[in-house]
Amino acid sequence: MSVSAPMKFIEDYGLIGDGQTAALVHRDGSIDWLCWPRFDSDACFAALLGTNSHGCWRLAPVEAGTSSRRYREDTLVLETDFELTTGHVRLIDFMPVEDGAFAVVRIVRGLEGKVRLRSELDLRFDYGSLRPAIEIDRDRAVGFVGPDLVVLHAPGQLSQRGSCIVAEAEVSQGEEIAFCLRYGSSTETPPPQIAANAALQATETYWRNWIGKFAIETRWPEAVRRSLLTLKAMIFRSTGGIIAAPTTSLPEAPASDLNWDYRYCWLRDAAFTTSALIDAGYHDEAKAFRDWLLRAAGGEPDKIRIMYRVDGSRRLEEWIASWLPGFRGTKPVRIGNAAAAQRQLDVYGELLDSVAAAAKVGIAPTELEGILIASVIGHVERIWDQPDHGLWEVRGDPQHYTYSKVSAWAAVDRFVRRADLHHAADETFVEGMVELRNRMHREICEKGVDRQRGTFVAYYGSDEVDPSLLNLPLMGFELCGILGDE
């Protein structure tokens, strides 16, 4: 309970979510990350990137002991067992998937003996910088600041100790208590308590019904099903947008400053996720993303961006939350993402691959989709020979990245092969794209290959390689005679 957030490890967190946002729950019973009401909203629990004083909700036995945890089969319901000298209790954490619920429910069940518990809710809005006003009425506490409001419903009397809303309870074998935290608007009546066990049953049913549609034989069924559930948790149910991750500023490497905000929808990452879901038989999610993309593109598809907010809006200005010390003390903590303004040519190929995969499983293109794709291809024709920041979103000078060029080639190739999209373009345009595809291939084979070593290079004029090049054969790109294919 007393461990400060900088001493924690990311592998000790479990994910719970409701398709609107997600929370990270540590094995010690502390929820250290939660943005409400959306994935890309401000965090009200930011201890993951700082200390407990930056917002968290700790619920655990008062006495020290050991803990173990697991997900309930085929769900995002997380169970943590605490074993102590006095007894054994189980903490069940989940987020109800009911529309408009905006809730975290925590149920404690006594399995053996008698265990004393303490709940300490330390709310901090605006990524740990704003302490709310708190009003307590017996077993209900309300915290609010600006437009945001959070209400805690507890099983007994609540009190305030410093900045924390505290509750203590004793659970014996066979007994059960429930806590419910809900988000609402500070201008409206605080949302009521949720029937915990009914919500638990409905949440389990939701996840099990969804994963129950997966019927493909695999050597690793449990791992695949868990991966699919996690991907599903990254989809913003209200729009169909797919985020890259529910967190910001977890460093790419220990003690590095490569800390980025991934709570947004990258077209590249979303296309990869969509393809995986299609392969697993989940076509509704693919169609929802296609529709999200059409809305995000609007009436000027040639201005399509590499990433968006979950609702399809485009403002992702990057700034630094200077008051947060960072995960395990690794600064800076970035909010927003400046890479949104970068040119990354690879997104167009991945986007067209995703559209092609959707068509193969019967998701028919709409007229608007045809217009979007034709416009995107016209845009690729205008910019494909320019340098970009590449798959790795390098923040230095742009280069002619080989992977980006091949991805741009793939976009044109997929368009040429998709006769069902040609209705949005005249015959001359299609013929021009055939020639462009061939011209792009010739240039890549000339400038993107080290003939002496028999390998592609990371970017034109370089002798470096990078892992993205391993994907070129999967994109259907003929390998310029490197492996004797020509």
Short names for language-model regions:
Residues M1-E486:
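Acidic, mature catalytic/reactive cores of soluble proteins
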